[in-house]
Each structure stands twice: as structure tokens, then as C-alpha cells.
């Protein structure tokens, strides 16, 4: 068990929920669960063919916003917070009428005022963007666009079940530029069945050529219950082995670094100053509020989520499985999330938050991991090396196990 003092004051425990983010900053995530077609790999809460529910769903979002604009257990959120980031994800937010998005963003001001220069991101599919929707997003204050490109190979796009073509990715970026967006992310996927290193390199080069500010490169995870999992289980599809996956990741690091994109988290790369501020809140364990079906929240040291069932959400079910995190929960989450970033774990911040040096009781594990080339300590931070990030889960378990 931990040698740290478990009898911290309630005031100190509450401070942990904002580990590196000022208390006054709040992030909001809004889930739009509708999509034109469920992708073969997707196990997110997304629902095709529910157009008739769009209006009801956003009415429920508005009702949830009204609840959060009223007095909560800790008082009015508007008295404590300013909204620093807002992220509209899905599903496919760009599928629904843009008016819903405009009204929802505007309504969030009832929860708390926006900080000057707040980052407001809308996620979307290149096949569902139009100039009219982009203009509406700009009017609503959206200043960052995240597009699910996934691949530039037509065959791979079809096998993934994507509804857009490779050509529409470039068209979407052009449309976004013409609408005034100067902060665009593209999501890419690797370790796909049938994808070789040449195809992955071509995808990286195609994304770089579009000149976007941010790129995310996610390794395919074959989730149980998805069509992709059924294909893999039947032998109809074969995913690359671990060595091939790691080689693809290293290719992304090298190719993107040469093009001016700096890796700042296991799966994310940005031009200097264009890191996704919203995701940094998650990795730094700042306070965030999730609105909509399946949305998760971390607020004032409490974690809770809305139901994943769209029908339950439409019926008014809210805030399931609410728990107040223990000190051990806080430490484990902090370690797991901070080591995803290139910056790593801030050792002074850890000691300030938890009352003892991180190294105490972990000397042997740290020594083994350093000797193995998986972690390094310097500049007041413990960070994972490139090799360490390839096995991040195992590194974190090693560090946690030393403290049991």
C-alpha cells in the first residue's frame, strides 16, 4: 500500500482535481451521438438512422445546461469558473443541422462565461461539411476544426466503413480555410488490416501536404462486439503485429517531426502553439463537464457520466455512477494521464499535491525502468522515452506496483 498520508484535509483533496489547471478554468464536452453510418471499428455511443430524434436530443441538452446553470452542491458554477475550452464531439456533429450547434454553444454561456480566446472545437466528417455549416460554426465562435480523415487510401476507407472519399478530405480542408479556420486537426489511423508501411507513409505525407496545424495518429484498437472484431476473429482480416505497429508509430514521429509537427502526447502532434488545449485538460486532470449521452465529467473531485443509451438520455436519465475519487485514485490517474504526454509527470507538483516525493517507495522500479531505457528523469519531470511510450501501460503498472 501507499506510504503517503491518507488523512489529507478535504481542502487538499479538492485541490487534486485541478492538478495542473487553475481552479477557474472549466472545459465542456458536448456529445452529438448521431452518425450517417456506424464505422466497422467504432464502439463509441453513436447511432445511425435517428434523424427524427435530433430535435428531442438537443432539447435534452438544453435542459441539462439549464440544470448546470443553477446552484449545484458547490454553488453556482458561474461564480467559480470560466469556460476555457469547449469540444463538440461524436458521432458526427457535422451531420446535424448547424443551428443546433449554434444554439448549444450560445446556451453554454448560462453555465459560465467564456474566457477571452477560449478554444472551441467542432469535430466532423469530411463528407458532411458544407460551406453553410462552416459559416454557421464560425458565427457560433468555433475556432478549431477536427476532421476524421483516418486514411487517404480508398480501399482502407471502405474497409473501415467511412462515408467519405480521400478526395473529400482535401476539399474539406479547403472549405474550412475559405470559411476562416486557421486551426485544423486531422485524425489518422494506423495498424489497420491490409495497411502496410508504404500506405501509412503515404497517408502521413498527404496529411502534411494539406498544411493543417495538428495531426492525431491513433493505432487501431479492435474492440469486442464491433464488425472489425468479427472479421479479425474469423480470419477475414489480419491486424499488424506489435513490431509492425511500433514501426508505424516511429515512422509517424520521424515524418511529422521533419515537417515541423512536435509530438506532445502519445498520439498527438502539433505545430508549436497549436496543441489541443481541450485534450490537455484531460491529461492534466483539470475540471471538465460532459453534456449529452455517454458524456463523462470530472468536477470538484467527483467523476460521473451520463447513460450511454440514447433512449435513456432522452428519457431524462442523468449522472450515473457518481463517485468521489480517493487519494489513491487521484494518484493513479495523475500518473497514467501525465505519462501520456511528452512533458511527463511534474515531480514538484506531485509532491505538492500528495505530500511526499514521487520517488519514495518507488526507487527500485524507477531504477529498473531507467536501466531499460523506458523512462528518464530530468528538469523536474519523469517522462517516458519513445520506447517507454510504446509500452506505457506496462510502465505505469510497474510504477504503481512498487507502491503497493
Question: Residue locations for each model-derived region?
Answer:
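Flexible, acidic/Gly-rich N-terminal and inter-domain linker regions that tether
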Residues: 1-26, 36, 71, 75-82
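Conserved N-terminal Rossmann-fold NAD(P)-binding element of oxidoreductases
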Residues: 30
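Short, amphipathic alpha-helical interaction segments positioned at domain boundaries
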Residues: 387-404
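Short amphipathic alpha-helical interaction segments
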Residues: 356-368
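A short, conserved structural fragment
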Residues: 371-380
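Minor-groove-contacting beta-hairpin "wing" of winged helix-turn-helix DNA-binding domains
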Residues: 381-385
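C-terminal scaffold of the Radical SAM
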Residues: 25-27, 46-72, 81-356, 404
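Local cysteine-cluster metal-coordination motifs and their immediate loop/turn environment
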Residues: 33-46
Amino acid at each position: 500500500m501507499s506510504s503517503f498520508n491518507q488523512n489529507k484535509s478535504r481542502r487538499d483533496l479538492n485541490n487534486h482535481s485541478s492538478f495542473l489547471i487553475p481552479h477557474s478554468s472549466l472545459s465542456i464536452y458536448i456529445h452529438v451521438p448521431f452518425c450517417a453510418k456506424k464505422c466497422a471499428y467504432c464502439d463509441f455511443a453513436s447511432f445511425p438512422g435517428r434523424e427524427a430524434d435530433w430535435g428531442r436530443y438537443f432539447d435534452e441538452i438544453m435542459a441539462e445546461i439549464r440544470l448546470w446553470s443553477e446552484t449545484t452542491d458547490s454553488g453556482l458554477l458561474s461564480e467559480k469558473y470560466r469556460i476555457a475550452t469547449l469540444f463538440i464531439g461524436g458521432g458526427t456533429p457535422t451531420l446535424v443541422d448547424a443551428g443546433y450547434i449554434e444554439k448549444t454553444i450560445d446556451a453554454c454561456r448560462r453555465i459560465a462565461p467564456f474566457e477571452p480566446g477560449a478554444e472551441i472545437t467542432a469535430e466532423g466528417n469530411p463528407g458532411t461539411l458544407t460551406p453553410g455549416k462552416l459559416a454557421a460554426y464560425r458565427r457560433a465562435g468555433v475556432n478549431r476544426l477536427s476532421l476524421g480523415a483516418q486514411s487517404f487510401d480508398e480501399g482502407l476507407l471502405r474497409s473501415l466503413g467511412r462515408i467519405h472519399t480521400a478526395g473529400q478530405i482535401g476539399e474539406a480542408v479547403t472549405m474550412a480555410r475559405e470559411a476562416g479556420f486557421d486551426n485544423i486537426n486531422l485524425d489518422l489511423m494506423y495498424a489497420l488490416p491490409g495497411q502496410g508501411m508504404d500506405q501509412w507513409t503515404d497517408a502521413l505525407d498527404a496529411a502534411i501536404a494539406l498544411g493543417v496545424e495538428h495531426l492525431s495518429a491513433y493505432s487501431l484498437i479492435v474492440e469486442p462486439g464491433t464488425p472489425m472484431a468479427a472479421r479479425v476473429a474469423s480470419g477475414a482480416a489480419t491486424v499488424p503485429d506489435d513490431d509492425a505497429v511500433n514501426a508505424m508509430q516511429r515512422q509517424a514521429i520521424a515524418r511529422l517531426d521533419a515537417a515541423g509537427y512536435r509530438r506532445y502526447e502519445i498520439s498527438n502532434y502539433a505545430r508549436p502553439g497549436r496543441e489541443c488545449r481541450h485534450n490537455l485538460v484531460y491529461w492534466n486532470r483539470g475540471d471538465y463537464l460532459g453534456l449529452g449521452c455517454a458524456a463523462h465529467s470530472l468536477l470538484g473531485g467527483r467523476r460521473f457520466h451520463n447513460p450511454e443509451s440514447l433512449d435513456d438520455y432522452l428519457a431524462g436519465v442523468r449522472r450515473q455512477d457518481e463517485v468521489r475519487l480517493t487519494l489513491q485514485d487521484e494518484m493513479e490517474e495523475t500518473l497514467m494521464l501525465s505519462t501520456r504526454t511528452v512533458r511527463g509527470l511534474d515531480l514538484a507538483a506531485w509532491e505538492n499535491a500528495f505530500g511526499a516525493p514521487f520517488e519514495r517507495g518507488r526507487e527500485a522500479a524507477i531504477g529498473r525502468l531507467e536501466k531499460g531505457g523506458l523512462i528518464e528523469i530530468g528538469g523536474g519531470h519523469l517522462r517516458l522515452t519513445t520506447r517507454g511510450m510504446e509500452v506505457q501501460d506496462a510502465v505505469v503498472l510497474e510504477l504503481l506496483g512498487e507502491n503497493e
